[in-house]
């Protein structure tokens, strides 16, 4: 463990050298992840997806089986059993959801988001940000503060009210929790909020656009969503199909900006909207498909993490 590492180093080398706590933890995590990758054996499985429809809906419902099937034989047997099965809505839940915008950019969150959204490396992000800063387009790009100046907050409020209307505005104060954070600096934001676009290289324009949208979104209203989950029973079988959909009642900050995540695999499914459904309603099967997949080895830690 990292706790014992420092004294050993200290004894063997010289009193001035210490393995930094954060560094030791990072090294241990990387070593453990490498072991996991080395010992990993990919396992085959089958993922089953069905398209079904109700009598009165033109749009099909995409539903996924709630378990993975371990082999081709199991998948074939399951598909065969679905040919003449009856499908019905066994459970239906509708939950209201609220999403709030993320805080303004710090150096590390800008690096992570530029990596995910724009495919930039850490050094590329910093190089482009440096040019934007030197051209007077953004505030200083090395900061761990999420604060915005009162001047910036006033301008953002004006911008939202003018372009989108008052219902999209919500005043928010963000506070830096990191110990020893440089509170003297602001978060990374456009120098002039009224400048929606800038002249410059394609990379500079893209990074500026990301910073501008994120900054505006920080002072916007929550997005109000509705998440519907439908469980579909398969006559005579224990397995169930599950269909999920998210409906946007009020887009709020999503009108301007959606934060990325490292796992984007669920995005396509979560964006689908389900037709009006009722518990007990029967469905007709349009299409069913079993896809061979393999379990994925754990990813290595990326530079931005």
What is each residue range found by the language model?
Residues 1-96, 186-251:
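Phosphate-backbone binding and catalysis cores of DNA-processing enzymes
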Residues 239-271, 277-279:
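Polybasic, glycine- and aromatic-enriched phosphate-binding surface used to engage nucleic acids
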């Amino acid at each position: 463990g990292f706790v014992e590492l420092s004294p050993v180093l200290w004894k063997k080398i010289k009193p001035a050298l210490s393995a930094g706590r954060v560094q030791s933890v990072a090294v241990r995590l990387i070593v453990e992840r490498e072991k996991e990758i080395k010992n990993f054996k990919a396992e085959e499985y089958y993922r089953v997806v069905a398209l079904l429809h109700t009598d009165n809906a033109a749009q099909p419902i995409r539903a996924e089986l709630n378990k993975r099937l371990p082999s081709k034989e199991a998948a074939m047997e399951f598909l065969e059993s679905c040919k003449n099965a009856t499908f019905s809505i066994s459970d239906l839940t509708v939950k209201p959801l609220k999403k709030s915008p993320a805080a303004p950019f710090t150096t590390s969150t800008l690096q992570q988001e530029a990596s995910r959204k724009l495919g930039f490396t850490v050094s590329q992000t910093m190089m482009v940000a440096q040019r934007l800063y030197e051209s007077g387009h953004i505030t200083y790009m090395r900061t761990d503060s999420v604060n915005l100046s009162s001047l910036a907050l006033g301008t953002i409020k004006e911008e939202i009210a003018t372009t989108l209307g008052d219902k999209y505005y919500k005043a928010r104060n963000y506070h830096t929790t990191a110990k020893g954070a440089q509170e003297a600096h602001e978060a990374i934001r456009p120098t002039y909020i009224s400048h929606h676009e800038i002249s410059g290289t394609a990379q500079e324009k893209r990074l500026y656009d990301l910073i501008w949208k994120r900054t505006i979104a920080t002072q916007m209203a929550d997005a109000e969503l509705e998440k519907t989950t439908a469980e579909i029973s398969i006559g005579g079988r224990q397995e169930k199909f599950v269909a999920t959909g998210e409906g946007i009642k009020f887009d709020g900050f999503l009108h301007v900006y959606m934060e990325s995540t490292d796992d984007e695999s669920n995005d396509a499914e979560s964006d689908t909207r389900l037709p009006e459904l009722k518990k007990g309603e029967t469905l007709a099967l349009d299409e069913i498909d079993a896809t061979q997949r393999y379990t994925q080895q754990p990813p290595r830690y990326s530079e931005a993490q």
